[in-house]
Regions:
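Active-site neighborhoods and metal-handling regions in enzymes and metal-associated proteins
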Residues: 1-180
Length: 180
């Protein structure tokens, strides 16, 4: 590997305790300002989705904008779903939960997000001929506050693998993004 740009590792495994799916992007040397910006946008996207609260009855289509807004506000996008359901000793891509901005009927992944569902949170950015970046954690859907508006849910992250902090461009992060 050359000491430049990024190395993207997408890995996982099947265990009696569950199925894992993770992606990390690692810097292999000095990066350009654009590479640092893109790495940071991917991280912001993942963190914002991981921190969202939502009412029961919500589907991934309703949450996808939270993850894509950092890209769309800059005229950027990634051409894959933001997340997919993760099975237990079955398929790493499992129905019925998923997070994407448009319907893909053959995926059958537009189910209501339920307590106990595990979903990947994996935004990315791919610039043809330059670099590809993705950061993926698994998130668990959990009950949160219940009030007069209904039952709120939230995500708890399940992935504890470090992220390359030296690559982050804090100048483009809001105070809230840094806190996440």
């Amino acid at each position: 590997l050359d000491a430049k740009s990024f190395y993207l590792v997408d890995s996982g495994g099947q265990y009696y305790e569950g199925t894992t799916d993770i992606t990390r992007t690692i810097a292999l040397g000095e990066l350009t300002a654009e590479e640092k910006e893109h790495f940071t946008l991917v991280l912001i996207s993942m963190l914002r989705l991981q921190a969202v609260r939502f009412l029961y009855g919500c589907r991934g289509l309703s949450l996808d904008y939270v993850a894509r807004e950092p890209f769309w506000s800059r005229g950027l996008n990634f051409d894959h779903g933001t997340g997919h359901g993760v099975g237990y000793l079955s398929s790493v891509h499992e129905r019925p939960n998923g997070i994407r901005f448009k319907m893909v009927p053959e995926r059958c992944d537009n189910g209501i997000l339920e307590e106990g569902m595990i979903t990947s949170d994996e935004p990315g950015l791919y610039i043809e001929g330059k670099h590809g970046i993705r950061t993926e954690n698994l998130i668990l859907c959990k009950k949160d506050e219940k009030n007069e508006y209904g039952q709120f849910l939230r995500f708890e992250y399940l992935t504890y693998v470090p992220i390359d902090l030296e690559v982050i461009d804090r100048e483009i992060m809001s105070e809230r993004d840094v806190e996440l």
